[in-house]
Amino acid sequence: MIYINARFLTQRKTGVQQYALVLCRELVKHIPDICFLTPKTDLIDEKWRGEFNILQIGNRNGHFWEQIELPRYLRSIGNPLLLCFTGLSPAFYKNCYFTIHDMSLYAYPKWFRLLYRAVYKVNYAIQARFARGVFTVSDFSKSEIEKYLAVDSDKITVLRNSVDTSINIKNNIENKVVRRKEILLVGTLEPRKNIEFVINSFLNSQIEGYKLIVVGGLGAAFSKVTFSQHENIIFCGYLSDDDLELKYREASVFVYPSLYEGFGLPPLEAMQRGCPVMASDRASIPEVCGDAAYYFNPEDSSDFSSKLRELIENYDELSPVLICNGYRRLEQFDVRDVASKLMDVISQRNI
């Protein structure tokens, strides 16, 4: 029996939760004996109760559950293999693979609260030493882990983010998609996502007829008050999967301006819906997007504005190329390949 730290099933879905969900949905097709361990809570969506073998344990939640009750339960049943896909894992639990999505708290510590940095740095340092192995989502993140944690390369396995294959990209081809004059951003409103940069650049560019649609929860370090009154800036907050799907399909351009990402899933989600992508040229983003994005310097407002204007003014010529390249790019991120690689790692190490 393999156990999965499924605390992510009790959390609001962002990139790391989406990563875990897509991968776990594929794993259960191939490995019958998987148990998903969660805190006792009513927050779990009923559809996951029907799809996963969920066992609720302990009496607490949050970090206490993850660091105390989860390993206590595992030790009581013989220390079975535990897989953790969303960041933190039980410190000192050795029969474990844990996932580091990025090293932003090392590269840009000012973006994070002191307590957050301390908790994650201690956990990463301990588990990098004691765990069986480390999963990460890109070659860029692997190199960053080696740099900041001094982990041997052989201990790190790259399991890339993958797209949800239940979404049929042929729908974009067979059914004519009506694109609105909308530029879409998706991401938590926090400093590293660089949303404020795009908002200011968009307003200064004075591109007529287009609206900037910002989707994502509000981060503590970012205030929307300054911009919320502008008629061409629309803050949607956190959207349901269905509403976000509609935004991807309606937008003329998807913009991804992050300064630092371990992977960056939203550009692939946009490509899957046939939406042309403009992306930052930093960190892992070129590794992920390849030739399927129109790149810009995320710290140069004039570069962003000129690239956006260029894409819009030459939309009929440039967008089909980006869309076609995007569909081809998606073939590199098939969840079946990721699950197969994970199972190979497990079997090769005689788990």
Can you describe what each PLM-predicted range is?
Residues M1-I351:
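Carbohydrate transferase catalytic cores enriched for Leloir-type hexosyltransferases
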